[in-house]
Swiss-Prot record:
This is UPF0285 protein Mevan_1551. Belongs to the UPF0285 family. NCBIfam families: methan_mark_12. Coiled coil: none annotated. HAMAP family: UPF0285. InterPro entries: ATPase_NBD, Methan_mark_12.
Length: 328
């Protein structure tokens, strides 16, 4: 059985090919490469397309569907609209459309929003949106990899999203625009609200550079800013302050959910979260009283493949989210 998992990330589209539950290949296409590349042509370099049994697709915010749904039944790519969600390149749209037009069996994974029934009603009352689809994939990866039923997952990368899983179901959490900062994205504070009101910037522009990058002089675009700041941690005072401040904000976010986390398990993921120099997870652990696990690798794409694989084995529920797909 061969499945493909897709992570629609800020800096690019990552794909994981899995055969009989084992990772066969992982590849990434940077956002800026999509003008000259076809996703399916790249996928053909790794696997015969006719051999694929199912693809697990993550696209944008996923706020237009509330189940893991057969792509043939999804309208408008599973989103309400594409406004206010960060820098738009168009690569994810191209990948989605190529997959749908190919007729390869595929499911679209939703994001976490008010329509997701497994979420605690208080979180849904507080926030219209909690996470994009790949965060569900990352949570499922952690759930399977570490055999955990109760844990906090903090995915730290271009943005930071922190989720709580209780009794094997997604309970709630904080979206990228709410609490902790990522390298690029973060919550909008008073200064940014004033700039928005004065029409100096849009709310989306404010969110897109409200992360740790605002502390530095190191913005290098959506693909290269992370490495620029991390590599300068020991050499540049502003970059060090930016990373240390990110760690503080993530620690605060994790600790704010700990009273709802009965086993004190914490999983750190994301390209920044798994960084070893500086050791981000160790820095966060020093601020937090919990049992720490680090989910290495391309956790979103792998998790999407795990979801597709388990659906083929008859799974009808993924972390509390229903599956709407018929196995032929």
């Amino acid at each position: 059985m061969i499945v493909v998992g897709i992570d629609h990330g800020t800096s690019g589209i990552t794909s994981c090919i899995m055969e009989n539950g084992l990772i066969k290949s992982i590849f990434k296409i940077r956002r800026t490469e999509f003008e000259k590349l076809s996703f399916l042509d790249e996928l053909k370099k790794h696997i015969n397309l006719s051999e694929i049994d199912l693809i697990g697709v993550c696209y944008s915010m996923g706020d237009g569907i509330n189940k893991i749904t057969d792509i043939s039944r999804v309208k408008n790519r599973g989103v309400r609209n594409l406004e206010g969600i960060g820098k738009k390149i168009g690569g994810g749209t191209k990948v989605y459309d190529e997959i749908k037009e190919s007729k390869i069996p595929a499911v679209v994974i939703p994001g976490l929003h008010k329509g997701i029934d497994c979420m605690d009603k208080r979180f849904n009352a507080l926030f219209s949106h909690t996470a994009s689809p790949e965060k569900i994939s990352i949570c499922y990866n952690a759930y399977k990899t570490f055999n955990l039923e109760n844990f906090i997952l903090s995915d730290i990368s271009s943005n930071t999203v922190t989720l709580l899983i209780r009794n094997g179901k997604i309970f709630g959490g904080f979206d990228a625009c709410i609490g902790a900062v990522g390298i690029l994205h973060g919550p909008i504070d008073l200064e940014l609200i004033k700039k928005i009101d004065l029409r100096e910037i849009t709310a989306n522009e404010a969110f897109s550079k409200a992360g740790a990058v605002k502390i530095t002089d190191s913005y290098k675009g959506v693909e290269d800013t992370k490495s620029e700041i991390i590599e300068k941690y020991e050499k540049d005072e502003k970059c060090k302050l930016a990373v240390d401040s990110l760690v503080l904000s993530v620690s605060m976010e994790i600790n704010s959910l700990m009273f709802l986390n009965p086993e004190n398990n914490v999983v750190i993921a994301g390209s920044v979260g798994v960084c070893k120099n500086p050791d981000i997870s160790k820095m966060i652990k020093e601020n937090t009283n919990g049992n720490f696990f680090v989910l290495d690798g391309e956790s979103g794409a792998i998790g999407s493949a795990m979801i597709a694989n388990d659906i083929l084995y008859g799974k009808k529920d993924i972390l509390g989210i229903s599956v709407d797909f018929n196995i032929e």
